[in-house]
Amino acid sequence: MIPPEQPQQQLQPPSPAPPNHVVTTIENLPAEGSGGGGSLSASSRAGVRQRIRKVLNREMLISVALGQVLSLLICGIGLTSKYLSEDFHANTPVFQSFLNYILLFLVYTTTLAVRQGEENLLAILRRRWWKYMILGLIDLEANYLVVKAYQYTTLTSIQLLDCFVIPVVILLSWFFLLIRYKAVHFIGIVVCILGMGCMVGADVLVGRHQGAGENKLVGDLLVLGGATLYGISNVWEEYIIRTLSRVEFLGMIGLFGAFFSGIQLAIMEHKELLKVPWDWQIGLLYVGFSACMFGLYSFMPVVIKKTSATSVNLSLLTADLYSLFCGLFLFHYKFSGLYLLSFFTILIGLVLYSSTSTYIAQDPRVYKQFRNPSGPVVDLPTTAQVEPSVTYTSLGQETEEEPHVRVA
């Protein structure tokens, strides 16, 4: 008898042995201490390069560069003021501020005057005139106090105490703008301040720490007062340009700044202005000062909106170094290698600060006083719990998990 066929056994193809694949994979792994470590090292280097490219991205470099443009404008302001006060004995800080406010008035206030609707100058004045009046006074007196301090205290004290604006901006941004910082931001801030301390140390070593110093306590208090007012003005500026517009801020600053500086000029500085030996050189210096000041005021809101008030004030720490580098050729200052160390230390701190975005724990109930009536208004339910939103403020999306925000 013929045995029955077994089709199932014939139809099943031989399955490949799984252990062969596993064995092959294990055999291909580089052994410890062998030449395979080179590939691991190459992958590590590639990972480091990728992280560096992520940190030094285009947006971050643009932000740092914009801050340095502001520093160069402040350098121009300082140089023209130095020539006016030391070479031509024209000590007119209020008049110089008055010229800047007049330019802002002519450009931005007139722009508001010709607008229609809720963005018109009269409509803005009806709703917010007293707030801009206070802001104009703060901005004017911040400039005046710091310039006045040079008559009483030393350059070293002014450079150190002027850094007080940074903690003022951080605290005001935290409580009023609800900006939240990460550890890397505080590390960057500390590095920037260390760079500033290095510059002051270099000034002491080369003998630039001397100053008038007639009444050092009064001068130091003037610097602290001016730095505090600067911080308030910068945070208020960021608040307005993020909720309203840059043109409105500059137009109202020009209006009230010109008004109050004109009054202060007539009361306190008219005699000094009459003593100025007017000629084409002095006129050119006033034009240069006004151009740099107008450029600073016009460009700073753009940089603040792209970054933040804190980032801008950190960037401005290099302004003294630019003035010093120019002074090496113009005023024959002594050079120290610590100046270069200070410059690059501040830049490293800026890179660290800008490498990670800050974020805003934004409660929709916060921005009420400067709300733009022409913009869309969203009615929030009164019975439901208002939940905050988390918005990154500077340099793009973060890959890490968004921090948890709680509203009390």
From Swiss-Prot:
GO molecular function: transmembrane transporter activity
Sorted UniProt keywords: Cytoplasmic vesicle, Membrane, Synapse, Transmembrane, Transmembrane helix, Transport
Residues annotated as transmembrane: 60-80, 94-114, 129-147, 158-178, 186-206, 221-241, 247-267, 284-304, 311-331, 335-355
Record carries keyword Protease: no
First-listed, main subcellular location of the protein, grouped into a coarse class: membrane
Annotated region (Disordered), positions in chain: 1-21
GO cellular component, one term: synaptic vesicle membrane
Subcellular localization, as worded in the UniProt entry: Cytoplasmic vesicle, Secretory vesicle, Synaptic vesicle membrane
Physiological role: Putative solute transporter.
Family that this chain belongs to: Belongs to the SLC35F solute transporter family.
PANTHER family per record: DUF914-RELATED (PTHR14233), SOLUTE CARRIER FAMILY 35 MEMBER F1 (PTHR14233:SF10)
Protein name from the UniProt record: Solute carrier family 35 member F1
Natural source organism: Homo sapiens (Human)
Gene: SLC35F1
